[in-house]
Amino acid sequence: MNSTSLYAAIDLGSNSFHMLVVREASGSIQTLTRIKRKVRLAAGLNNDNHLSAEAMERGWQCLRLFAERLQDIPQPQIRVVATATLRLAVNAGEFIAKAQTILGCPVQVISGEEEARLIYQGVAHTTGGADQRLVVDIGGASTELVTGTGAQTTSLFSLSMGCVTWLERYFSDRNLAQENFDDAEKAARDVLRPVADELRFHGWKVCVGASGTVQALQEIMMAQGMDERITLAKLQQLKQRAIQCGRLEELEIEGLTLERALVFPSGLAILIAIFTELNIQSMTLAGGALREGLVYGMLHLAVDQDIRSRTLRNIQRRFIVDTDQANRVAKLADNFLKQVENAWHIEPISRELLLSACQLHEIGLSVDFKQAPYHAAYLVRHLDLPGYTPAQKKLLATLLLNQTNPVDLSSLHQQNAVPPRVAEQLCRLLRLAILFAGRRRDDLVPEITLQALNENLTLTLPGDWLAHHPLGKELIDQESQWQSYVHWPLDVR
């Protein structure tokens, strides 16, 4: 592999050190390596902000691992940044001098505002949805809050609170009592209050979380079969569960890994304070943050206004998808959706996911015609899809699995991006669009009227169409039968 196409970003965080190695390929990035080590540097800071020798040694040990991987990458294509703990430590110079010797490249201690800007860039390049956003990143010793529209930030704040420092300060006795949470939340709200007005002034349409705490919450919610939107009610529920556990070493929540458990209660307390102080309705997980911001900055790639469209284009190119056919199916599905929207009230995001499934429905053919829907579902489940959340990826895979043949109803109910009933409706529209676009020519798609009454679909074709299309009639009869097996009434006229 040509090393000039390789880029590395290293983030010396207060809780973990991370390394991301990517390959640049025709304007998009392909992840090659991700290494994360819990160094807990912030835990080595004493009251005088002096970093202990033990904490420094843990950091250097980790960097020796990273250094081996960096040998193959040109130095101008490596960026190493240090954040909150090394901003605070009075003896940071000692740590950084040795770190630079180990890595063989400069280490830059960045300001809180620069960290916030890079986090925002990472989110803007990798996260779909409305482009007026609030980004929240709870680190080990600092929390970044950024508002922005598209690629531009409108306000940037880096606050001195993090999941490691709050752990040492409010959960040092390892008790998970109501009082510990109350003290941690109150302190976090006090830190937030001076910046809350400006953040609210700039406003946001979506709130995105980009940290280990939010990642942990996502994993918990997926494991417990909840939808992936983080709300204050869910945070309070998890807090009560933590309080029931009583002690940090006894903290057990389905979906919470041992690795994340130590700083989970302190991160949770900070997040509850942020939700309360800023009156956040819901939050989703970001596709990337600081390291992605560093990489995209080195590549000088512009922020794509529609990340999901860029992702779909890249995948279609990679798997040699017939884009004319993908567009034909999408156009037909959208037409069907418009005809039933008064009865089914399908939300814009669900429409977008249906059209995404249309764009990708033939990627399984790149493996083999036999079992193409299974191959398509497998590929979507395992591909990196910037702009789509894990739950949305699961829904796309499920729709592609059920694009033809008998319907696996349980799979539509096991995804949690949309309610099961909506997943069923999207699946029905996708199947019909694929069926009627089957001859791969615009002029051969009949005029179809679709009406919905509750779950009953009535499909009306031009007068003598069925008589002149015996194969088409056979396929429609088969589809009607498959839909009836799962109690989806389809009446064809």
UniProtKB/Swiss-Prot annotation:
The keyword Coiled coil does not apply. One of its GO terms (molecular function) is guanosine-5'-triphosphate,3'-diphosphate diphosphatase activity. It comes from Salmonella dublin (strain CT_02021853). GO terms for biological process: guanosine pentaphosphate catabolic process; guanosine tetraphosphate biosynthetic process; nucleobase-containing small molecule interconversion. Pathway: Purine metabolism; ppGpp biosynthesis; ppGpp from GTP: step 2/2. It comes from the Bacteria. It catalyses: guanosine 3'-diphosphate 5'-triphosphate + H2O = guanosine 3',5'-bis(diphosphate) + phosphate + H(+). Its EC number is 3.6.1.40. The keyword Hydrolase applies. Keywords: Hydrolase. CDD domains: ASKHA_NBD_EcGppA-like. It is an enzyme of class 3 (hydrolase). Belongs to the GppA/Ppx family. GppA subfamily. This is Guanosine-5'-triphosphate,3'-diphosphate pyrophosphatase. Catalyzes the conversion of pppGpp to ppGpp. Guanosine pentaphosphate (pppGpp) is a cytoplasmic signaling molecule which together with ppGpp controls the 'stringent response', an adaptive process that allows bacteria to respond to amino acid starvation, resulting in the coordinated regulation of numerous cellular activities.
